[in-house]
C-alpha cells in the first residue's frame, strides 16, 4: 500500500525546538489571561455548518464534510462564533470574561502561502457595553506581547461603524459594496476617485481621503474630523480618541480609518497588531454587539481579541528570543532489577534521561551520536560512570 506522504495544502509539521516554543507560548498566553481574571472555555473543532453560515461569515473559507448521518459539518474557521453558540445555548450568566486557545482551519487558495491550520488564542468579553471592554481587550493584547518580549510592535485602531455609515449613506448594491470594500482595503486612490465620481454624496471629501487617513492617532483623527459633519462618523472618531487617550501610555498606537475586517460582524472599535519582523498582523479583534442574535432572539454587547500563536512563534524565533532546549547531559543506563534506583537518580539529577538500550555499548554509542557528555550504569551494585566525553 502506497501512502501519500505529502501534507494537505497550508499545513506543516513542527519539530522539536519549534514545537516546544509553540507549546510554551500557548501556555504563557493562557496563563496571562488567567491572571487577568478570564475563565477558560473550550469548544469542539468540528461544528455544524449553520454556526458559520450567517451573513456575518459569508466570506469564510470553510473545510466542509458530512458526518455519518449525512449532516454538513465544518472545521471551525474561528473561535468567536462557537463561543457565541455556547453563551447563547447554555444559559450561562452574563457578563462574562472568557479565554480560549486551539486550532482553527481556513481553506485558503493554493499557492497563496497562507497557513490553513493555525493555532489561535484570545479572549471574549460578553455583556459589557462600556468602552472599558475595548480598553481591556487592547491592554490584554499589549500585555501578552510584552510578556512574550515581542519587539517593536504597534497597535492599529479602526472603527467598523465608519465603513458601515459610509455604505449606508451611499445605498450600495451588494456587488458595488464588495467592489468598494476592495478599493478601501487596497487603499486605491485612483479607484476611489473614480468610485466617488460615479457615486456622489455628501461624504465625497471624507471618502476621497480614506486611503490617506492612517498613521499617528491624534493627527489623523483631527484631520478626519475636519472632513465631515456626519454625526455617526464623528461619534465613531470621538470613541477612537477616548481609547487612544486611555491606552497610549502602554504602546505605540496608530489609526487606520480604512481598516475593514474580513468578518462582517464587527460593529464598533476594531484593532490589529503589527511588528517590524512580521509580514502581516498577528493580533486582531473588535466589538460585535449583534453577533449573538443569530443564536438567540436577544443581543448582547461583546468585544473580542484573537492572537495568531504561529505568527508569534515565528516572531520570537526571528527576534532570537526562543531559547535552545536544555540538552541532556547525563544518560542513565540501567539493569531492570535496578529500575527503582535509576528512576530515583533521574528524578534527582537535572537534564538526565533513561537509556532504553539493552547493552551498555549501545547506550554509549547513542550518547556519542547525540553529544551527551556522560553515561552512567545503574545496577544492584550501585552507580558507575561508563563513559565521559573528553573536554577539549
UniProtKB/Swiss-Prot annotation:
One Pfam family hit: tRNA-synt_His
Cell location: Cytoplasm
Give UniProt keywords alphabetically: Amino-acid biosynthesis, Cytoplasm, Histidine biosynthesis
Q: In which pathway does it act?
A: Amino-acid biosynthesis; L-histidine biosynthesis; L-histidine from 5-phospho-alpha-D-ribose 1-diphosphate: step 1/9
Indicate where this protein is primarily found: cytoplasm
GO biological processes: histidyl-tRNA aminoacylation; L-histidine biosynthetic process
Cellular compartments per GO CC:
cytoplasm
* Highest taxon of the lineage: Bacteria
Q: Which InterPro entries match?
A: aa-tRNA-synth_II/BPL/LPL, HisRS-like_core, HisRS/HisZ, HisZ
An example molecular function term from Gene Ontology annotations = histidine-tRNA ligase activity
Q: Which HAMAP family does the UniProt entry name for this protein? A: HisZ
Query: Quaternary state and partners of this protein?
Result: Heteromultimer composed of HisG and HisZ subunits.
Q: Kindly give any further remark recorded in the entry.
A: This function is generally fulfilled by the C-terminal part of HisG, which is missing in some bacteria such as this one.
Give the similarity note.
Answer: Belongs to the class-II aminoacyl-tRNA synthetase family. HisZ subfamily.
Q: Which NCBIfam families match?
A: hisZ_biosyn_reg, PRK12292.1-3
| Its biological purpose | Required for the first step of histidine biosynthesis. May allow the feedback regulation of ATP phosphoribosyltransferase activity by histidine.
What is the protein name given in its UniProt record?
ATP phosphoribosyltransferase regulatory subunit
Name the source organism: Listeria monocytogenes serotype 4b (strain CLIP80459)
Amino acid at each position: 500500500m502506497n501512502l501519500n506522504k505529502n501534507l494537505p495544502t497550508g499545513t506543516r509539521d513542527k519539530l522539536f525546538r519549534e514545537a516546544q516554543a509553540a507549546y510554551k507560548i500557548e501556555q504563557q498566553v493562557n496563563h496571562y489571561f488567567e491572571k487577568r481574571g478570564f475563565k477558560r472555555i473550550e469548544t469542539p473543532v468540528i461544528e455544524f455548518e449553520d454556526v458559520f453560515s450567517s451573513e456575518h461569515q459569508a466570506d469564510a473559507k470553510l473545510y466542509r464534510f458530512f458526518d455519518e448521518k449525512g449532516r454538513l459539518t465544518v472545521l471551525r474557521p474561528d473561535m468567536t462564533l462557537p463561543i457565541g453558540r455556547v453563551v447563547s445555548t447554555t444559559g450561562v450568566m452574563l457578563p462574562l470574561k472568557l479565554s480560549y486557545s486551539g486550532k482553527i482551519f481556513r481553506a485558503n487558495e493554493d499557492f497563496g502561502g497562507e497557513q490553513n491550520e493555525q493555532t489561535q488564542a484570545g479572549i471574549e468579553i460578553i455583556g459589557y457595553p462600556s468602552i472599558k471592554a475595548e480598553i481591556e481587550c487592547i491592554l490584554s493584547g499589549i500585555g501578552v506581547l510584552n510578556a512574550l518580549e515581542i519587539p517593536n510592535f504597534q497597535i492599529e485602531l479602526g472603527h467598523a461603524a465608519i465603513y458601515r455609515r459610509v455604505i449606508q449613506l451611499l445605498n450600495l448594491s451588494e456587488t458595488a459594496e464588495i467592489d468598494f470594500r476592495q478599493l478601501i482595503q487596497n487603499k486605491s486612490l485612483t479607484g476611489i476617485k473614480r468610485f466617488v465620481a460615479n457615486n456622489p454624496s455628501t461624504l465625497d471629501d471624507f471618502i476621497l481621503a480614506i486611503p490617506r487617513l492612517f498613521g499617528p492617532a491624534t493627527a489623523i483623527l483631527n484631520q478626519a474630523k475636519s472632513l465631515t459633519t456626519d454625526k455617526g462618523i464623528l461619534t465613531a472618531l470621538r470613541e477612537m480618541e477616548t481609547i487612544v487617550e486611555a491606552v497610549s501610555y502602554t504602546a505605540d498606537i496608530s489609526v487606520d480609518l480604512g481598516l475593514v475586517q474580513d468578518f462582517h460582524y464587527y460593529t464598533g472599535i476594531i484593532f490589529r497588531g503589527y511588528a517590524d519582523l512580521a509580514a502581516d498582523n498577528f493580533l486582531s479583534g473588535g466589538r460585535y454587539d449583534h453577533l449573538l442574535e443569530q443564536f438567540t432572539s436577544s443581543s448582547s454587547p461583546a468585544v473580542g481579541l484573537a492572537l495568531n500563536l504561529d505568527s508569534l512563534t515565528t516572531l520570537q524565533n526571528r527576534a532570537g528570543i526562543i531559547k535552545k532546549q536544555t540538552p541532556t547531559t547525563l544518560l542513565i543506563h540501567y539493569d531492570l532489577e535496578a529500575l527503582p534506583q535509576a528512576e530515583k537518580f533521574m528524578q534527582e539529577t537535572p537534564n538526565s534521561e533513561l537509556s532504553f538500550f539493552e547493552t551498555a555499548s549501545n547506550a554509549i554509542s547513542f550518547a556519542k551520536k547525540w553529544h551527551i557528555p556522560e553515561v552512567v550504569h545503574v545496577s544492584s551494585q550501585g552507580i558507575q560512570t561508563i563513559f565521559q566525553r573528553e573536554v577539549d
